[in-house]
Amino acid sequence: MEILVKYENGFRFSAECRGYTATTGQGDDGKKERDGMWPAQLFEASIGMCIGGYIAKFCREQGIAYDDMTVELSRHIKTVSSGTKPSGAKISRTTGIDAQIRLGAKLSQEQRQGILEAADNCHITKSIEEGLQIVCTLVDVEANSTLKTI
């Protein structure tokens, strides 16, 4: 197991990985200091941090100052009614993300191109672009069996 996600309360979950913990959502216990971004926001922030990491690596290798770098993300969301879900619930998804990269350093055209290529190499965006498959299984603790989604 690489990451363990645990329900806390309300709509708050925590994820543990390599000794680090991230918290998402809001609990109903009044402990606002334990609340965090919603999971979709954390997902999108992860993309920005991944892009930033690849740019930082490129800038370090090229001797380009990047201490003041920011990556500003704007997301596009699509919401549709689900005709296939029994509840008829609305389903939303992020359909696109615009990332604006800001660096204070004076850059040549070649450096600009290199930075954009580095940004495009982000592991998360490459995984999404190539088609990320997620398989959910439900473990029946009492029966000690596993059910996969269809």
PLM segments and residue spans:
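Alpha-helical metal-binding/catalytic segments enriched in His/Glu/Asp
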Residues: 50-51
